[in-house]
């Protein structure tokens, strides 16, 4: 996921590729990033850039997040540094316990279509200002669609993305309520209309239960 995000960001207008540093644990992954765009700052095992980064996106396995933060993100850093985790199952409370209360923290749930700027990304934040919220939304919005939600809704949002379930597209399939689970009905069409973001409307329409006895 980290590589997909870096590749997507390198092709949008928010950042210059040379201002994006991608840290890998394996040299083979570093070579892949360099092959995609030599201007990206791809390194292997060098975390020194985290001390000066304005935005840090953590895209590692969930069980690695705590150690990474404690080892590389608890020292000197710029004021207003934003930390974004895209690791599944990591809560804002955990991030705050490991990283501290004095920085903006976010959990984001993108999908791999982010590489081609067609992701639907759900985001929740803590200790953040409105300006920081707008910045993070702009970043992920440049990579598809982005929506700021309450943390309790990240689970349902993940299920929607994982199973490609878009019942709000078909009024009546849920008894006429116009929603699937606890996600707000408002914006459901915007979240679900693009096949490149994993949607399969025709298949879902066939699977949706019929109403009205037809």
Task: Name each model feature, range by range.
Residues 1-45, 118-119, 176-182:
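NAD(P)+-binding Rossmann beta1-loop-alpha1 motif at the extreme N-terminus of oxidoreductases
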Residues 16-19, 79-81, 187:
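Short acidic capping loops at alpha-helix termini that bridge into adjacent secondary structure
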Residues 20, 30, 49-50, 185-191:
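Small-residue helix-packing motif on alpha-helices
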Residues 27, 36-37, 45-123:
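Rossmann-like NAD(P)(H) cofactor-binding subdomain of soluble oxidoreductases
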Residues 41-48, 147-149:
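Short acidic-hydrophobic, aromatic-tinged amphipathic segments that line or gate anion-handling sites
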Residues 94-104, 120-156, 167-206:
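Internal alpha-helical scaffold of NAD(P)-dependent oxidoreductase catalytic cores
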Residues 201, 210-214:
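Extracellular beta-solenoid/beta-roll
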